[in-house]
């Protein structure tokens, strides 16, 4: 008898959900993280109230064994001795519209929990209670129904019989997919150098799974050189493991759209090489990017009266799934948009619903790691999932950003101004919050007076507006660290968070009542900012600090996640195994530490490309430290000129900042006007990025030198093979800018392990250096030169971070020696 694992909520919602997508209900349960409201109600219920009770059972229906599991919000015994199953829901629906029969799914979920609990405890009957928490009014509305065990059993059996045809479809597909993957062949005639080694590591990690002595299954860090074909080296072995029953679903997680496309292309290659391959995939894209019916401000309007794709969505989705799941399919962004128009359903929600029936899910990191938007249908509990995390060197900073939040006082001031004259509940709440942040700004200035020598006192944005004899009404606790009008605190002051929380309800009321107001977009942005800060406050613990920064009349409040390790660890623990790979994951101890993978295996694959194909040089007589940059400009320009004059072709020069880039470019263009240059501008969109890269043509008729920023969109994730790029210069060791936040990070890790400077500066900087240098050699046939410009590249602290294929680096004393060395290299 076949077995199907099925979360209770998924069973109920799939069968019984009808009607429309309505953000007034579904959206706010997610957006406000209803979990903290659940905890509040559960705590208030008293000692006899069991919260978050895990329930599971095996039931047979239509020759299928269903393994059902879920968590009941609460179970308790009332004053009459009757057991009560409590189902808690948060909603923005007005109180007068909350009725007993508002949503049949809510009763059904409680009844399924009741059926399981009654059977396990031999209860002849019990009560199911629906508890609605109205987020605007804090009103609690409850409804209670009594059921016999027989009624609950019959209800559950009926649901399982209704779901059985869909379960049978899943069973038949799983058999077909497994057989197909078992016969899967590598889609190329032979492995590239290094591919087989990487594939073997990932295959073994997927097979080991949760049998390994590692929380949440096997963790693998795999550093593999650029150009070996990491995407296929990761996907192919993971799919082979799935074909052997090791993994139910594969999640390919990326930091950039370009790597999502690479994963899609790899799957297309597999389908092309093996047309009979039974494999479904879906690419998840942010709702804002795929919305077919945005409002006037360009935001998704997820209300049935505003969006035809939201209206009646749940009445049409099963027909759409029936048609789309008839065979294999690769549902990328374009395919989802086409299907959404065909069936008149929301493309974003369609992608989510399809993901339950697809074997491979491609998406951004946030679908696993972000606590707000992660895929609850998969990751609220653990499963037999395989995680492939591409460009994993980006994950520490991305994870810190996901768990942190930032709020600016000016957004409150501007919102008050936008509302104009007159009184309202919203304006009162905004005024109170604005006043609280004003007092915090005063206290911040007194605790950390600006003393930076780089400050221009004539700049009003940098000048304190607080009279010396003005005492703040808000007293901040003793700071952990203070510098340049920035204060770091161990805990966020409740005097700031409470008034910000109080803004939410009246702000939402105003937004719903004034959808066509001219300032709607501005206040919606404020609403999201308040949400972000209150969400972060819910998960705040010892891995966070509170940052207050005063700039002129502005105050920035940040709940800053310094150490994302426990949060990343918990996310990865939802799966069977996780392979995190990149060209730059050194040193492995750093990534194990900051990503919460202390027991992970780490491998570093040697470059398979001939060492003689890379000319690697360093001029250690140049200092690019901040204090030396102005004096170094001409020396850097001269070195760049020698690099590109040695051979006609396309080159890149990567800098630690835009300001330094512009300084050198201005000098270079004036002194070497015969060399064509191209300068990376900040905030390029996809079209501008593509246009920039299109200038790097194969076998160019003239030399081109592109000026870019390390860690930017051209410093990594760019594949310019062959003669499209034959050399690059790395100007500096890539250290992040020294600022109070980086200094707080340094202090945190100094206290944790004594490696504060390495964790906050040296390791992230060298990561950027190695990524930028990796743009040059992309295939075994490529030849190219890399020039390092900074004296620190000759220091042991940096040399020990060089990859093995950099052993042949040559240190030169002058531009003349560089020119001669390059001539020798290109003449070979």
Language-model segments: what does each one mean?
Residues 57-154:
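Mg2+/Mn2+-dependent nuclease catalytic core
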Residues 656-681:
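Conserved helicase motor "Helicase C" RecA-like lobe of SF1/SF2 P-loop NTPases
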């Amino acid at each position: 008898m076949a077995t199907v694992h099925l979360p209770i909520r998924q069973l109920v919602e799939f069968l019984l959900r009808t009607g429309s997508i309505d953000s007034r209900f579904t959206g706010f349960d997610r957006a406000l993280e209803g979990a903290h409201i659940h905890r509040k109600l559960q705590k208030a219920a008293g000692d006899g109230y069991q919260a978050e009770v895990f329930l599971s059972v095996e039931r047979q229906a239509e020759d299928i064994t269903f393994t059902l599991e879920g968590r009941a919000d609460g179970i308790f015994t009332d004053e009459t001795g009757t057991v009560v199953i409590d189902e808690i829901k948060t909603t923005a629906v007005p109180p007068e519209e909350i009725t007993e029969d508002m949503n049949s799914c809510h009763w059904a979920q409680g009844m399924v929990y009741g059926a399981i609990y009654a059977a396990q405890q031999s209860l002849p009957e019990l009560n199911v209670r629906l508890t609605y928490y109205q987020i605007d009014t804090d009103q609690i509305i409850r409804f209670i129904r009594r059921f016999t065990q027989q009624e609950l059993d019959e209800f559950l059996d009926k649901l399982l019989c209704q779901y059985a045809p869909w379960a049978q479809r899943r069973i038949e597909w799983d058999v077909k997919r497994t057989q197909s993957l078992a016969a899967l062949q590598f889609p190329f005639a032979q492995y590239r150098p290094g591919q087989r080694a990487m594939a073997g590591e990932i295959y073994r990690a997927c097979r080991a799974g949760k049998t390994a002595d590692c929380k949440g299954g096997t963790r693998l860090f795999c550093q593999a050189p650029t150009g070996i074909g990491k995407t296929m080296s990761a996907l192919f072995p993971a799919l082979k493991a799935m074909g052997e029953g090791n993994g139910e679903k594969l999640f390919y997680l990326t930091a950039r759209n370009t790597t999502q496309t690479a994963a899609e292309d790899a799957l297309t290659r597999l389908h092309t090489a093996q047309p009979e391959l039974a494999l479904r995939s879906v690419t998840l894209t942010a709702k804002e990017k795929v919305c077919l019916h945005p409002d006037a401000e360009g935001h998704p309007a997820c209300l049935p009266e505003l969006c035809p794709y939201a209206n009646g969505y749940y009445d049409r989705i099963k027909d759409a799934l029936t048609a789309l799941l008839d065979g294999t399919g690769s549902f990328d962004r374009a395919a989802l948009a086409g299907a959404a128009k065909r069936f008149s359903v929301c493309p974003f929600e369609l992608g989510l619903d399809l993901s339950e029936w697809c074997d491979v899910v491609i998406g951004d990191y946030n679908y696993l790691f972000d606590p707000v938007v992660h895929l609850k249908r998969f990751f609220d509990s653990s499963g037999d999932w395989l995680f492939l995390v591409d460009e994993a060197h980006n994950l520490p900073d991305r994870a810190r950003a996901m768990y942190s939040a930032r709020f600016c006082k000016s957004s409150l001031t501007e919102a008050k101004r936008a509302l104009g004259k007159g009184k309202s509940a919203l304006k009162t709440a905004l005024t109170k919050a604005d006043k609280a942040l004003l007092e915090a700004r005063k206290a911040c200035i007194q605790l950390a007076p600006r003393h930076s020598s780089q400050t221009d006192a004539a700049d009003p944005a940098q000048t304190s507006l607080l009279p010396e004899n003005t005492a703040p009404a808000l007293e901040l606790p003793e700071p952990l660290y203070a510098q340049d009008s920035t204060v770091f605190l161990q805990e966020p002051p409740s005097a700031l968070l409470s008034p910000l929380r109080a803004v939410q309800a009246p702000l939402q009321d105003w937004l719903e009542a004034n959808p066509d107001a001219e300032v709607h977009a501005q206040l919606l942005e404020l609403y999201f900012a308040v949400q972000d800060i209150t969400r972060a406050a819910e998960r705040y613990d010892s891995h966070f600090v509170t940052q207050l920064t005063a700039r002129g009349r502005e105050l920035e409040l940040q709940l800053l996640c310094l150490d994302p390790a426990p949060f990343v660890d918990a996310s990865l623990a939802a799966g069977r195994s996780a392979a995190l790979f990149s060209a730059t994951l050194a040193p492995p101890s750093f990534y194990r530490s900051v990503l919460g993978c202390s027991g992970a295996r780490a491998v570093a694959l040697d470059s398979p490309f001939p060492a003689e194909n890379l000319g690697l040089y360093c001029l250690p007589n140049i200092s690019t430290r901040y204090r030396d940059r102005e004096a170094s400009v001409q020396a850097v320009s001269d070195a760049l000129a020698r690099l590109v004059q040695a051979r006609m072709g396309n080159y890149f020069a990567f800098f630690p900042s835009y300001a330094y880039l512009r300084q050198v470019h201005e000098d270079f263009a004036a002194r070497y006007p015969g060399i064509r240059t191209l300068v990376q501008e900040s905030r390029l969109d996809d079209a501008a990025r593509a246009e920039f890269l299109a200038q790097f043509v194969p076998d160019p008729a003239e030399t081109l030198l592109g000026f870019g920023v390390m860690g930017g969109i051209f410093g990594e994730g760019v594949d310019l093979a062959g003669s499209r790029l034959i050399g690059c210069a790395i100007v500096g060791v890539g250290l992040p800018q020294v600022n109070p936040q980086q200094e707080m990070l340094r202090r945190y890790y100094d206290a944790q392990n004594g490696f504060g400077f390495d964790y906050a500066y040296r390791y992230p900087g060298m990561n950027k250096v190695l990524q930028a240098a990796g743009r040059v050699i992309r295939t075994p046939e490529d030849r190219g030169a890399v020039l390092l410009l900074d004296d620190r590249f000759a220091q042991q602290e940096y040399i020990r971070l060089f990859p093995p294929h950099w052993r042949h680096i040559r240190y030169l004393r002058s531009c003349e020696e560089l020119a001669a060395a390059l001539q020798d290299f290109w003449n070979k």
